[in-house]
Structure formats: structure tokens, C-alpha cells
């Protein structure tokens, strides 16, 4: 991570920039410099290209010059890949953490905890819309209930995380921000994600590092396998035994914070 590079973080879905402050053992002060673009689909409607262009313009306005380091967590990897192809040689490197691969690249859904959401988005936009409305209602009025529903089948070290009050409180706020107040963004971006984007991977010319928890049942290891085969400039893959989705993010952010501390 170059001292001169600007860092851009793409959160998961549901998610927000609050992910950077989720973990008590990762000092947020070492991460606070990261730029988290606003992912607002209200003006781009169902146009994925316009949506990605709007995010790219935010980054260019924030960082007119200098190399850029992209970090994509979970479904944020989908956005990071697209932005990398638009920013081109401005991007110095990419870290994909618990990355969601294109669904058309494998039989992943049967291994994914959130399969019902993606199946609805693929097969029935109407049903998906109803599902998002229910999630939005629950996030605003009963965030703890929604948290328990989403984290009912956690695996690996995510089980320990999900049992901690600090993580529960942080995720409840994230769910309210993402689903309660910005459900339209969540709905639009998942619709973009399931529409097929595997061809974008071959356009990524920057070095990529994959961070994959081997116990992840949100974005299973098979997704990292597919990305490894498709990305032309994969420079490293970090397989983390016993870690699942958010525990892999915690591990990555901890390493990033330690590296930032060494450079300070």
C-alpha cells in the first residue's frame, strides 16, 4: 500500500462505511482516511453503466491526481471491478475481501446464506421488490430481529463476532442505513449484480489480491476459485482458515491498520 496512494473502500450490501468501525480490535483511526463513495442509484435508475460512471466521477473529484488503491468487500467487489476498468491506470492495486463473484460463473447459490435474495432478484423482480420492502421495514422498526434473521446461519469465526454486543450494535446501524433509509440502492445494485458481469473480469489490468475465508458461507471459497481463474493479473490469494465473511474483513482491516501504523 503506497504512502502516496489514495484508498477507496466499497462496502458490502447490505452495508455502509460503518463496516470500517465494526471491530473493536481494529483501530478506526488507521482507516478513517479511506474514501467511501456514495452509491446512489436514484438518478441512474436501471442503468448499470450510468451508475458506475457516477461513482467514478465521485472518486475523480475527490482524488484528481495520484494512484488509487481499491478495496471491495463482499458485493463491493462487484463495484470495485467495474470502477477499476473505468479508472484504468489510475488504479495501483485492488484488494477483494470475501468477494462476490458473478453468479453465472458457477453453481454458487446452494452454498450461499443469502441465496433466497439472489434467487428472487434473478427470477422475480416483483417478489424481490416485496422482499426488499419487508427488509426495509424490519431494519427501521426491528433492527435486532433483522440482525438475528440475517446472522442465523453464521459459520466459522463469524459466530463469535455475531455474539458480541459491539458487533450487533454496529450491524444494526449499518442495516438501518443500508436497508432502512437506502433500500432503493440495495435493490438496484443487487439487480445489477445478478444481471451478469463475468466479461468485466478480463478487462481488469491491475494487480489483484483475494482474501478468502475458508469457512465463508456468504461468498463461498468456490467464488474465489472462479475469480482466480478469470482475473488476468491476480498477484496473490490469501486463504484464511476458520474465518468466514466478516471475520475475513476484520483480518484484512487489521493487517491494513498494522501496515499503516508501520508507515506512520
Please report, for each region that a protein language model flagged, where it lies by residue.
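Active-site loop/oxyanion-hole signature of alpha/beta-hydrolase fold enzymes
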Residues: 35-68
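Catalytic histidine-centered segment of alpha/beta-hydrolase-like enzymes
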Residues: 218, 237-254
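Flexible "cap/lid" loop of the alpha/beta hydrolase fold
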Residues: 94-135
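Gly/Ala-rich beta-loop-alpha elbow adjacent to hydrolase catalytic centers
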Residues: 71-76, 80
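Conserved HGGG/HGGXW glycine-rich cap/lid loop of the alpha/beta-hydrolase fold
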Residues: 2-45
Amino acid at each position: 500500500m503506497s504512502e502516496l496512494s489514495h484508498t477507496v473502500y466499497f462496502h458490502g450490501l447490505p452495508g455502509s462505511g460503518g463496516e470500517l468501525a465494526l471491530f473493536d480490535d481494529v483501530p478506526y483511526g488507521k482507516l478513517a482516511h479511506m474514501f467511501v463513495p456514495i452509491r446512489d442509484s436514484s438518478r441512474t435508475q436501471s442503468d448499470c453503466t450510468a451508475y458506475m460512471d457516477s461513482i467514478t466521477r465521485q472518486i475523480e473529484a475527490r482524488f484528481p491526481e495520484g494512484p488509487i488503491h481499491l478495496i471491495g468487500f463482499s458485493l463491493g467487489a462487484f463495484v470495485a471491478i467495474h470502477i477499476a476498468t473505468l479508472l484504468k491506470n489510475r488504479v495501483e492495486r485492488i484488494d477483494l475481501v470475501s468477494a462476490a463473484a458473478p453468479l453465472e460463473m458457477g453453481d454458487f447459490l446452494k452454498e450461499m446464506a443469502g441465496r433466497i435474495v439472489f434467487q428472487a432478484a434473478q427470477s422475480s423482480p416483483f417478489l424481490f421488490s416485496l422482499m426488499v420492502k419487508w427488509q426495509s421495514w424490519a431494519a427501521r422498526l426491528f433492527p435486532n430481529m433483522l440482525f438475528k434473521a440475517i446472522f442465523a446461519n453464521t459459520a466459522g469465526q463469524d459466530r463469535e463476532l455475531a455474539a458480541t454486543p459491539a458487533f450487533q450494535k454496529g450491524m444494526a446501524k449499518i442495516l438501518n442505513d443500508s436497508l432502512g433509509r437506502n433500500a432503493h440502492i440495495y435493490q438496484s445494485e443487487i439487480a445489477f449484480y445478478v444481471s451478469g458481469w463475468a466479461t468485466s473480469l478480463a478487462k481488469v489490468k491491475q494487480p489483484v489480491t483475494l482474501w478468502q475465508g475458508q469457512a465463508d458461507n456468504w461468498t463461498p471459497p468456490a467464488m474465489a476459485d472462479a475469480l482466480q481463474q478469470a482475473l488476468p493479473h491476480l498477484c496473490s490469494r490469501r486463504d484464511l482458515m476458520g474465518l468466514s465473511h466478516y471475520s475475513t474483513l476484520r483480518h484484512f482491516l487489521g493487517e491494513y491498520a498494522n501496515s499503516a501504523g508501520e508507515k506512520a
